[in-house]
């Protein structure tokens, strides 16, 4: 079933994010570029409900019934309307991180050590912490230790996490392995949309390429990804489209041409548009 997300007029209450509108398709990697302080992180955090939204909407659309009539969703216009001309779509509240998770969103934060991991807890706790409801034993306030152990082992294997034990404190892992634990945590929630804020920041080259491969694999599985990055080559090499932010607003959208020099110049022009 083909899906897409449409964000319209998203404005945050306590930061500079203003009137952000864009479309995100199923299986797409959408980049977000911009200078420091341009509102990139604020965009992701507002989408996730971590920051207070003042106005704007997030809607889910489903194109399955259109594709069934012949052709693919791309063959049709970008908007679907009912017989009265009103746009059809399921509005998503995302007024808190908890509601965003229930709606299929996941956020990998920029500051891994400060807001991503729980340093004194072990790998198992860090892996299952966003999905604890699935480990409850009936009506009792107890968790299934065996199920948590199985899921953690599965994520360690799937993410190629290097650790002597799932009981190892996560603070003792390398930055790359810590980041892979965070990705594994969110995979257990089976998200539709992944919000990635500088996901390869502060990790070694080998781990970076593993993260790139993981992102591409998730997109092929139909996950929709919004990725902020401070590294232009990373965005150009990974993303289908790139939103460029300037002074809290989306200044434009760019589709990489394959000419790195030209692409970077065009993106920098947009990044300075509202300064």
What is the predicted function of each stretch?
Residues 3-275:
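Glycine-rich phosphate-binding loops of nucleotide-dependent enzymes
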């Amino acid at each position: 079933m083909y899906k897409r997300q449409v964000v319209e007029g998203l404005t945050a209450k306590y930061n500079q994010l203003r009137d952000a509108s864009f479309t995100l398709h199923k299986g797409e990697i959408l980049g977000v570029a911009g200078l420091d302080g341009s509102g990139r992180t604020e965009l992701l955090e507002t989408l996730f409900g971590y920051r207070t939204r003042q106005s704007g909407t997030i809607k889910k659309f489903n194109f399955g019934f259109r594709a069934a009539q012949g052709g693919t969703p791309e063959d049709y216009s970008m908007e679907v309307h009912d017989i009265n001309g009103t746009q059809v779509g399921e509005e998503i509240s995302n007024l808190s991180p908890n509601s965003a998770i229930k709606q299929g969103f996941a956020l990998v934060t920029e500051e891994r050590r400060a807001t991503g991991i729980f340093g004194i807890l072990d790998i198992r706790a860090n892996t299952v912490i966003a999905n604890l409801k699935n480990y409850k034993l009936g009506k009792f306030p107890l968790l299934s230790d065996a199920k948590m152990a199985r899921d953690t082992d599965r994520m360690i294997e799937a993410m190629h996490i290097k650790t002597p034990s799932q009981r190892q404190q996560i603070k003792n892992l390398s930055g790359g392995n810590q980041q892979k634990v965070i990705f594994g945590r969110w995979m257990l929630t089976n998200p539709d949309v992944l919000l990635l804020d500088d996901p390869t920041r502060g990790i070694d080259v080998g781990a970076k390429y593993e993260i790139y491969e993981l992102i591409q694999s998730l997109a092929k599985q139909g996950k929709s990804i919004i990725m902020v990055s401070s590294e232009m080559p990373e965005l150009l090499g990974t993303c289908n489209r790139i939103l460029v932010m300037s002074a809290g607003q989306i200044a434009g959208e760019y589709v990489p041409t394959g000419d790195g020099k030209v692409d970077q110049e065009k993106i920098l022009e947009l990044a300075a548009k509202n300064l």
